[in-house]
Regions:
Chain B
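ABC family nucleotide-binding domain
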Residues: 15-241
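ABC-family P-loop ATPase nucleotide-binding domain
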Residues: 1-24, 264-267
């Protein structure tokens, strides 16, 4: 088969696997991960020592161990203690935990980057800590965290290829299957790379648009 | 009522709005307050002056719970004594904040909210007053400081003087018993200082109770009923402005006043 034809015939299934596997996997994990990240960031900066310590340990474990190992512990490890999780939930679980750990540090730094005077102005207006956070601090921290969180998201999209190793039929696993049939590794894997690249390009454009939107109120 | 009349009237009338006794505060090795007393009557303007590091801002911030003194007693409007030997509860700190409002050196406006939303945030969401009333009052206050046309602007679109006037309006909208000003003009370009001081002076003349930390001695002389000169964490001297500025009793006060009014003399 001609290489160009192979490219044309493989890009369809690979892109489809991106749409049905990679993108939903990344999107769902990112949303759960952000919730975890926000929670962990708030725990980390709280004055409650135990909460803070728990968050610190969680972040340390996530950042200090390979994602692939985390994935294997959940998918291949947990069954040995009687917990069997399907490929998809395993992947979402692992990726969410991962985003949670990295995102927590991003959000913590963003919260700390908001000047102390903002807290004080809110307090003197009678606001409590929770209201100050939600109304005053987090909206400002959100702007600061867009670029680093976009990085996290883009990394996540690429990291979902690891899910092929726990049998999730996402983009890369589909590419592997096509390559195994055709033996044209170069073309097939370059096609896979191209699709990842296009997805990440779109995400970068989204990041730019979001930054512009959030920049409306801020002097630059 | 002339200034002197008002001053006589307040100092002699009923119990003080606020008394602070023997405030002590230490930041690490640095003892910034070494026993400061302050009495504030309703309708009175008290101005704190002194060199930087003298503790005047810390005194101000102790009055609304932004700082917690290590020792000392605070009484607000005949309420229970707050003895700082035991750290005050959250409720106590909130009670202090609810009675006062603060204008900051760096305005601390909320950059993501428009001018009007900066002003109504507290009255609407914390005090839960009706929106119509809050909006009308906020617009009235913006009009009186000449910023009616800026209500939908964002803080970064305003000049420093305008930002600080919004800061003042935001404080007034809370209807506090006590206004606290923390060096409200120190961060402004010199040509913008006047427009802010004029507003504060008007509020003083209207009978708002306020404590002002400032380096603007001319303003202190004009607007204050009572001036405290702090140095090294103690009140070195206090009294009505005429007395303190024209006939300071202490050498430290004299030196400070000279340094500010004639900065080139020592050169």
């Amino acid at each position: 088969m001609d290489l160009w034809e192979l490219f044309l015939s493989s890009i369809g299934p690979i892109a489809l696997a991106g749409l049905t596997g990679t993108i939903p996997l990344a999107l769902i994990s990112f949303v759960f991960g952000l919730v975890l990240a926000l929670g962990a960031a708030l725990m980390r900066i709280s004055e409650h020592r135990i909460l803070s310590a728990v968050a610190r340990v969680y972040i340390s474990i996530i950042r200090g161990t390979p994602l692939l190992v985390q994935l294997f512990v959940i998918f291949y490890g947990l069954p040995s203690i009687g917990v069997v999780v399907d490929p998809w939930p395993s992947a979402i679980f692992a990726f969410s935990l991962n985003v949670g750990g990295y995102g927590a540090e991003v959000i913590r730094a963003a919260i700390l980057s908001v000047p102390k005077g903002q807290w004080e102005a809110a307090y003197t207006a009678g606001m409590g800590r929770t209201r100050t956070l939600t109304r005053i601090i987090l909206p400002q921290a959100a702007r600061v965290s867009v670029p680093p969180l976009s990085n996290t998201f883009i990394s996540l999209v690429k990291d979902t290829s690891l899910a092929s190793l726990i049998l999730v039929s996402e983009l890369f696993r589909t590419a592997q299957q096509i390559a195994a049939f055709s033996y044209k590794f170069m073309v097939v894997y370059l096609t896979a790379a191209l699709v990842y690249w296009v997805i990440c390009l779109v995400l970068s454009l989204g990041q730019d648009a979001l930054e512009k939107r959030l920049d409306r109120h801020v002097a630059r | 009522m002339s200034h002197a009349d008002r001053q006589r009237a307040v100092r002699s009338s009923a119990p003080p709005l606020l008394t602070a006794r023997e405030l002590h505060k230490r930041f690490g090795d640095n003892e910034v307050l070494k026993g400061v007393d302050l009495t504030l009557y309703r309708g009175e303007v008290v101005v704190l002056i002194g060199p930087s590091g003298s503790g005047k801002t810390t005194v101000l911030r102790s009055l609304n719970g932004l700082e917690t003194p290590d020792a000392g007693v605070l009484t607000l409007d005949g309420g229970p004594e707050i003895d700082f030997v035991t750290p005050p509860s959250k409720r106590t700190r909130f009670a202090l904040r609810d009675r006062s409002a603060m204008v900051f050196q760096h305005h601390n406006l909320f950059p993501h909210l428009t001018v009007i939303n900066n002003v109504i945030e507290g009255p609407l969401r914390v005090q839960r007053r009706p929106k119509d009333e809050v909006m009308a009052e906020a617009r009235g206050l913006l009009a009186r400081v000449g910023l009616s046309d800026k209500e939908n602007a964002y803080p970064h679109e305003l000049s420093g003087g305008q930002q600080q006037r919004v800061g003042i309006v935001r404080a007034l909208a809370l209807r506090p018993d006590l206004l606290l000003f923390d060096e409200p003009t120190s961060a402004l370009d010199p040509e913008l200082v006047g427009e802010v001081l004029i507003v504060i002076k008007e509020l003083a003349d209207e009978g708002w109770t306020m404590v002002v930390v400032t380096h603007e001695l001319a303003f202190a002389r004009e607007a204050a009923d009572h001036v405290l000169f702090l140095d090294g964490g103690v009140v070195v001297e206090e009294g009505p402005p005429q007395q303190l500025f024209t006939a300071p009793a202490h050498e430290r006060t004299r030196r400070f006043l000279t340094r500010i009014m004639r900065p080139l003399d020592g050169v």
